[in-house]
Amino acid sequence: MGWPQFMPSSWVKYAIDFDADGKVDLFNSQADVIGSVANYFKAFGWQTGMPTHYPVSFDTSKLDLDTLLAPDILPSFGVESFTAKGAVLEGPALQHPGKLALVLLENAGAPPTYVAGTDNFYVVTRYNWSSYYALAVIELGDAVRALVPSR
């Protein structure tokens, strides 16, 4: 329902009057829409400042792809365990404090793409369970953020 396409149960639980006009309006109030989606993410564990995902490559001599993919998109591996199974992380990903999931994205005949998904990636998939949707929304958000002047 409305711009965020909330199910009725999500409207009841997560929709908020973010513009403080006395009513929740997910059809006409951009503030209520954005605030309600943010409230939904918060309820599912969004962690401010945590990246949604990191690039990942593989050390094929150690790669245990079946084990890495077994939990699907649920973050289940600490960095040490993730890399011990053949995932290669770089830079800030090596210091990630939480769990990671290996997210597989098929590419219609081309080799698949993989990312190391964090708890925040998982939160986005609670809104829409598709990993493709999650990555598209994340990349769109990054593009919008790049166009908005810093405050």
How would you describe each model-predicted region?
Residues 59-151:
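C-terminal soluble interaction/assembly domains
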Residues 1-100:
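Flexible, glycine-rich surface segments
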